[in-house]
Amino acid sequence: MKTSKTSIYLIIALMAMTGCNDQTETQSQNTETHSQDNKPKDTTKSKEPTIENPAVEKETYSFQKTLQFKGISFDVNTKGIGSLRQLVIQPKGFEETNKSVELEIDGKVTDAQVADLNSDGFPEVLIFTQSAGSGSYGNVIAFSANGVKSMSRVYFPPVSENTKLKKGYMGHDSFSIKESALIQEFPIYKEGDPNSNSTGGTRRIQYKLVNGEASRKFVADKIIDLPSK
């Protein structure tokens, strides 16, 4: 009888221990769940990588000018920097062809002018250039309109081709149009003059536009040597 009571007490004790363990495990699970609920949630949305468009490099012009004459126009510009540049002349208004002309020049464009230099009622476009370096030698790039149809290149003779003109010539030219004539001026250097200081005065050349065998050309018409001031 005593053994039966002892067995009953053992069973009751085991049941009590099992209940406590279940309660402890349940509390532990509840605590863990509550801890997870209290953790800060990552609300940051995943961002897709953005692709930036590469910057488009704008065309840069070292010279740009538009000239107009009685319904015909010329867009003149140079691209690039440094001594070698690309000269572009884009005509507009001709009936047959308005194809652009591209030329490589040594130096820079100082100015561009339009005028009727042969009194035919149609324009000539003249681009004045200056070479790089201490001499700054000048040149004229010119085109003459063939009526309303198109335009053709005009020949401009270098000073070195004319014995009288080249005496004392060391560059530093300037160009202009006066009374429908092309004018070129440059300082005259005497023997021994440094490039930075001429003492021989100024030579002024007036050109006229004439018809040549293959194309129109400029011819020196008047030459005047002006004394130093």
Regions found by a protein language model. Name each.
Residues A16-G19:
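C-terminal motif of bacterial Sec signal peptides marking the signal peptidase cleavage site
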Residues N21-T110, F218-K229:
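Terminal domain-start segments
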Residues L84-Q86, S134-A142, G192-T199, R203:
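Structural motif
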Residues S150-N211, K222-K229:
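Short aromatic loop motif centered on NTY/YTY
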